[in-house]
Each structure stands twice: as structure tokens, then as C-alpha cells.
């Protein structure tokens, strides 16, 4: 996820505009909280908030889709190519964040299923 951003910085391109930082900050906080919640559930094996976490991740992905479409519209309306590299880096960040959420959701579902199947097998052995 960070490779295009690192390349962008290493090549001395312009930094992201403050407006993009401001737009992305609540997304970053929300994704960090989702990752923390997912980690807690997987590491403790306690899945009481499982459905809420998946629903929140879906909502975040939907919001990212809107932001991405809005950004694509901004790119199409902009005149000139001065900011194209910065715009592409930001677009990539939005897309990779969506992908991260998809992988996180998949990992949470798989971990829960693995635990439940293991408990089911232990129960059948005990019977």
C-alpha cells in the first residue's frame, strides 16, 4: 500500500495538498479503529462485536467509494497536468485503503470460522 507513496516521496514530488490530508484523516482514524477492533477479536477469540465490525468496515468501504469517485471527478475537472502525480498517488491511497478493508474483513471472517469449526470438532470429540 505504501510503495507508491514512498516512490512519490523519494522522487521529490509535491506533497499532498492540505485538503487531501483533511479529507483522508477521518478515514485513517476509522480504518485504524477497525484494525484495532479486528486485532482484538482475533487475538482474544471473542467475537461479540463481529457483525458490528463487519458492518462498520462495509460502511467505510462505501464511503471510500464515494470519496474515490469525488476525487476522480476533481481530476477530470482540473486543468493542466501539474498535480497529476499527486492526484494519482492520492487515488492509489484511496483504492489501497479499500483493499485493506476487504482483506481485513476476510481475515476476520476466516478467523471466526476457524475458531468455531475447531470448537465444533472438540465438542463432537467430547460427545
Identify what each model region corresponds to.
Residues 1-127:
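Cytosolic, long alpha-helical scaffolding segments
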Amino acid at each position: 500500500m505504501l510503495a507508491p507513496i514512498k516512490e512519490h516521496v523519494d522522487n521529490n514530488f509535491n506533497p499532498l495538498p492540505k485538503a487531501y490530508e483533511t479529507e483522508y484523516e477521518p478515514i485513517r482514524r476509522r480504518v485504524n479503529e477497525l484494525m484495532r477492533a479486528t486485532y482484538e477479536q482475533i487475538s482474544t477469540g471473542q467475537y461479540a462485536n463481529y457483525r458490528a465490525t463487519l458492518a462498520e468496515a462495509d460502511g467505510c468501504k462505501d464511503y471510500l467509494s464515494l470519496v474515490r469517485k469525488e476525487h476522480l471527478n476533481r481530476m477530470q475537472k482540473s486543468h493542466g497536468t501539474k498535480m497529476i502525480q499527486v492526484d494519482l498517488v492520492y487515488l492509489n491511497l484511496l483504492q489501497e485503503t479499500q483493499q485493506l478493508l476487504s482483506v481485513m474483513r476476510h481475515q476476520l471472517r476466516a478467523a471466526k470460522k476457524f475458531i468455531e469449526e475447531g470448537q465444533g470438532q472438540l465438542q463432537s470429540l467430547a460427545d
